[in-house]
């Protein structure tokens, strides 16, 4: 347990007894963070990394890491409230109990994601893949992807940073088994 200093300077143990401790056999993915309180009945506001942001509510259960212990966090209900996501955590009934969760990152197991069709990939599958152009020059490794609104862009770090649109004709092939992405991209761009 971790001591949490509350606004009135009283210490209280952060107790997440409603959670089940477990060990991850599966890769975990960061999907959001509890960032503030909502109301007085123990609801919390969630900053979601999912797109669209309300999709975070469909990935249940959430997993949290408290003092190096992975735990399952049960959500009783959640919804979109104006421009934010709010949720009620099981066995949390007031704002003082909810305060202990502020700042905690929310994860899911990768196995919780829906199966994709052949040729479709989650961004997480592409991070770390080596990117090679048609001239067989290694541009670097995918460090991130950016959604520009019209298409996604691979951010590649190598001798220099490259931003390659993740669309045809620039994207030629993704080979997950060999950890390679083949692109039609000049090394000087």
Curated annotation (Swiss-Prot):
A single cellular component GO annotation: ribosome
Protein name according to UniProt: Ribosome maturation factor RimM
UniProt xrefs under NCBIfam families: 16S_RimM
GO biological process: ribosomal small subunit biogenesis; rRNA processing
Record keywords, A-Z: Chaperone, Cytoplasm, Ribosome biogenesis, rRNA processing
UniProt keyword Chaperone, yes or no: yes
Pfam families to which the protein is assigned, alphabetical: PRC_RimM, RimM
Sequence similarity: Belongs to the RimM family.
GO molecular function: ribosome binding
Organism: Ruthia magnifica subsp. Calyptogena magnifica
């Amino acid at each position: 347990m971790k001591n949490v200093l509350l606004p009135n300077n009283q210490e209280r143990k952060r107790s997440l007894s409603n959670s089940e401790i477990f060990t991850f056999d599966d890769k975990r993915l960061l999907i959001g963070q509890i960032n503030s309180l909502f109301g007085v009945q123990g609801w919390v506001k969630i900053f979601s990394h999912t797109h669209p942001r309300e999709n975070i509510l469909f990935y249940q259960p959430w997993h949290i890491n408290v003092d190096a212990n992975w735990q399952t966090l049960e959500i009783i209900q959640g919804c979109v409230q104006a421009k934010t996501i709010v949720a009620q955590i099981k066995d949390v009934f007031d704002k003082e109990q909810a305060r202990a969760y502020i700042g905690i990152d929310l994860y899911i197991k990768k196995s919780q994601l829906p199966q994709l069709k052949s040729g479709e990939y989650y961004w997480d599958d592409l991070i770390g893949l080596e990117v090679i152009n048609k001239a067989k020059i290694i541009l670097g490794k995918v460090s991130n992807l950016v959604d520009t609104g019209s298409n996604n862009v691979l951010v590649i770090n190598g001798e220099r940073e490259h931003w390659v649109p993740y669309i045809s004709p620039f994207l030629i092939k993704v080979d997950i088994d060999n950890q390679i992405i083949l692109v039609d991209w000049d090394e000087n761009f």
